[in-house]
Amino acid sequence: MRLKVATRGSRLSLLQTEEFLAQIKAVEPRVDFEIKIVKTTGDLVQDKPLFQIGVKGIFEKEVNLAVLKGEADIAIHSLKDLPSEISPGLVLAGFSKRTLPYDAVVSAVGYDLESLPKGALVGTSSVRRAEFIKSLRPDVRIEPLRGNVDTRVQKILQGKYDAAVMAAAGILRLYGESPPVKLSLLRPELLPPPPGQGIVAAVVREGEGWLIDLLKKASDPRATVEALAEREFLKNVGAGCHVAVGGTAFSRNGYIEFIAGYAASGKRFVVKLFGEDPVEVGRRAAEEIKRVAASVR
């Protein structure tokens, strides 16, 4: 049995794809894979911050299109790149084991949020990261930083930025436990990660029952629960990449802790909720964030 798999061509995307395909192979050893590399809008447009590109799903649309057109059987994504609603005719069918969902202060010298010098140049093209950092350290300068993980790491090592705020998962997946830069993890109470960060997801065509069943069997149970909660949060909060909203779930022993936050105008607001039903917890977290956001406008 041979499956065609569509994915982006960055080193991180290919590593994530290999990891997830190994999960599938572990439950169905007879399956083989053929990789189809797809260029996305987000890969091609590198001279603008993400929120200025003005297109939804800039890292996923073209990859999913390959599946819709029958050029591939599975599309592999970072879950955080998937909008709340994916293209009609497709279904989100599987989730990898989760790497750390946290963001991190990334630098050559080991800065954490507190030790960044006044006036330090911090790189990020994420509105969420920028607004939360402004609320925590209004005395640092924030400038756009685009490119794949390797490119951003090199710009830090070259001294073009004092630090950057990046997903810890990407750096750990690329470089393992000995990256060329130093990471200071940011607790979600300080900077709530985006929904889905650290999880790799598989998208397939609707009606592919056997393939959906295979991906469900290969999925990590804990990541699946957390993904359900975070996707429900994303769907109900109604925030795109131009709004500083984050939310992440932690599933332990059948119980879910959900941390969500909103930042604007130099202020940040963080809520913490608990429950057993991932959909219900995600929906409640979204309602809390919408209430908070409405009160500060």
From Swiss-Prot:
Biological or metabolic pathway of the protein: Porphyrin-containing compound metabolism; protoporphyrin-IX biosynthesis; coproporphyrinogen-III from 5-aminolevulinate: step 2/4
Entry note: cofactor: Binds 1 dipyrromethane group covalently.
PROSITE patterns: PORPHOBILINOGEN_DEAM
Chain positions found as S-(dipyrrolylmethanemethyl)cysteine: 241
Enzyme class: transferase
Cofactor: dipyrromethane
Gene Ontology terms for molecular function: hydroxymethylbilane synthase activity
Biological-process GO terms, alphabetical: heme biosynthetic process; protoporphyrinogen IX biosynthetic process
Note: The porphobilinogen subunits are added to the dipyrromethane group.
Protein role: Tetrapolymerization of the monopyrrole PBG into the hydroxymethylbilane pre-uroporphyrinogen in several discrete steps.
Protein family according to the UniProt entry: Belongs to the HMBS family.
Protein name: Probable porphobilinogen deaminase
UniProt source species: Pyrobaculum aerophilum (strain ATCC 51768 / DSM 7523 / JCM 9630 / CIP 104966 / NBRC 100827 / IM2)
Encoding gene per record: hemC
